[in-house]
């Protein structure tokens, strides 16, 4: 499964995942340290994407080294999320050397190679003024395309990503002052008459290491997530539900008609 172990342990028996689709979630976190001053009726949202990109090795592929892959957590718009996320802990399959990988700066990702698909746990730890409890995410590493009848190709990787929106209710004043106007975060309309705290002094962005993924080497393969995408999928799902309801109503009407016919015949 790995390039650092000769173990022949089979990959965990996991169900196949679907083609890359928008899985829209909204995860509401618990409040941060109660000692900090809270801003009531305000929520800060951080849209994130997590998943993997996998490349088949072609002629270089072997029985235990068929793919190179990367698993990651990134901002949904490829902005730097380290303003909120302090570190990410990736838990790989036990057959890897050092299966627990701690990434303390962006990009929050792990690159490896191997042959098997398995579930990867990702634990996000936040800065102390954000939230004192971590968030656990789970991703099934996908190496092979859904269409198994077609030939494998080195030109296009397998990409599987999921979207989540982490919501922090009643943020601390220091948190809001530190991150306001940051492009990786979204803020709802503030209550009437509410004044934002003064922005916190930050270091020179020109000297700070760039933490976004806009120029990432895998960026061309990243999926695009937006509210428009979500609305389109919700509309499509609603149409499917309505069509299913209409079909059930027709079936019920047909059954009721048959029952009425049988009842009329028995009364003769």
From Swiss-Prot:
- Location(s) in or outside the cell: Cytoplasm; Nucleus
Location of the region described as Disordered in the Swiss-Prot/TrEMBL record: 1-36
Q: Coiled-coil regions in this chain?
A: 229-263
Please classify the protein's predominant subcellular localization into one broad category.
Answer: cytoplasm
The intrachain disulfides are: none
Expression across tissues is: Expressed in roots, leaves, inflorescence and flowering tissues.
Pfam families, alphabetized: YEATS (PF03366)
Question: Which intervals hold domain YEATS?
Answer: 38-182
Q: Which GO terms describe its cellular component?
A: cytoplasm; NuA4 histone acetyltransferase complex; nucleus; Swr1 complex
Keyword set, alphabetical order = Activator, Chromatin regulator, Coiled coil, Cytoplasm, Developmental protein, Differentiation, DNA damage, DNA repair, Flowering, Nucleus, Transcription, Transcription regulation
Phenotypic effect of disruption: No visible phenotype, due to the redundancy with TAF14. Modest early flowering. Taf14 and taf14b double mutants show a pleiotropic phenotype that includes small size and abnormal leaf morphology. Taf14 and taf14b double mutants show a reduced H4K5 acetylation in the promoter region of major flowering regulator genes including FLC, CO and SOC1, and a more pronounced early flowering.
The GO biological-process annotations, alphabetized, read as:
cell differentiation; chromatin organization; DNA repair; flower development; regulation of DNA-templated transcription; regulation of flower development; regulation of photoperiodism, flowering; regulation of timing of transition from vegetative to reproductive phase
- Domain of life here? Eukaryota
Xref: InterPro entries: YEAST_sf (IPR038704), YEATS (IPR005033), YEATS_dom (IPR055129)
Q: Where is the composition biased (Polar residues)?
A: 1-20
Spell out the subunit comment: Component of the TFIID complex. TFIID is composed of TATA binding protein (TBP) and a number of TBP-associated factors (TAFs) whose MWs range from 14-217 kDa. Interacts with TAF1, TAF4B and TAF12B. Component of the SWR1 chromatin-remodeling complex. Interacts with FLX, a component of the transcription activator complex FRI-C. Interacts with SWC4, and with EAF1A and EAF1B (via HSA domain).
* Its biological purpose: Negative regulator of flowering controlling the H4K5 acetylation levels in the FLC and FT chromatin. Positively regulates FLC expression. Component of the transcription factor IID (TFIID) complex that is essential for mediating regulation of RNA polymerase transcription. Component of the SWR1 complex which mediates the ATP-dependent exchange of histone H2A for the H2A variant HZT1 leading to transcriptional regulation of selected genes by chromatin remodeling.
Q: Which family does it belong to?
A: Belongs to the YAF9 family.
Name it.
Answer: Transcription initiation factor TFIID subunit 14b
**Gene that specifies this protein:** TAF14B
